[in-house]
Amino acid sequence: MNYKTYITKPKPNNHKRKILGLNGLNHDASACLLHGKEIKFAGHNERYSDIKFDEDITQPMISDIKRYGDWDEVTWFERPMKKKGRQLWAGQYSEVFTRKNLPSNYLKQFNIKPDVYIDHHLSHAAASYFTSPYRESVGVMIDAIGEWETATIWYIKTHEDGSTTFEKRWSQEYPHSLGLWYSAMTQR
């Protein structure tokens, strides 16, 4: 099978990217604000709402993020239209034919517009790799479900020029999911 390779390109030294990464509309809504390679803010919304596994991003968390800095770019942790394709295939019509779970619509309440949508498993791979001390590694991502993928294996390497390659070596797609089986057994 042919898998996609993703490459990050470093910006010139005088350009410090300011990125707000958001995850919401499912369990564990969270955010991370990066200025260059420095984490300015990282948090889960359940710390603000006192609701375990809270799926909603709330104004108190957004206000707290703004105290730590601004951003030039907003990334969302999955590709919503790809996810809707899987939901349509699975017969989850109420999820497919609503706009409330589209990030572009959902984030209007905070006056935020997503600039970039990242594949769900690539989001996991990047988060695990960039918070590790390694310059080369294999990443194994297993969860209930991303857009379609339920498990992926990546070869990840940062090169001398500062670029990082994420090469997907294997993936398993819905409905086959170790994570969904785990959720069914643990009722989580």
Annotated model-derived regions:
Residues M1-R188:
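Short acidic/glycine-rich loops and adjacent helix/strand connectors
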